[in-house]
């Protein structure tokens, strides 16, 4: 995986937890 995929995945998880 690329770094971009990791960043996007982390962002989605963070957004879900924040919501």
Curated annotation (Swiss-Prot):
<comment type="function">
    <text>Catalyzes the reversible oxidation of malate to oxaloacetate.</text>
</comment>
<protein>
    <recommendedName>
        <fullName>Malate dehydrogenase</fullName>
        <ecNumber>1.1.1.37</ecNumber>
    </recommendedName>
</protein>
<comment type="similarity">
    <text>Belongs to the LDH/MDH superfamily. MDH type 3 family.</text>
</comment>
<keyword id="KW-0560">Oxidoreductase</keyword>
<dbReference type="GO" id="GO:0030060">
    <property type="term" value="F:L-malate dehydrogenase (NAD+) activity"/>
</dbReference>
<keyword id="KW-0520">NAD</keyword>
<feature type="binding site">
    <location>
        <begin position="9"/>
        <end position="14"/>
    </location>
    <ligand>
        <name>NAD(+)</name>
    </ligand>
</feature>
<dbReference type="GO" id="GO:0006099">
    <property type="term" value="P:tricarboxylic acid cycle"/>
</dbReference>
<keyword id="KW-0816">Tricarboxylic acid cycle</keyword>
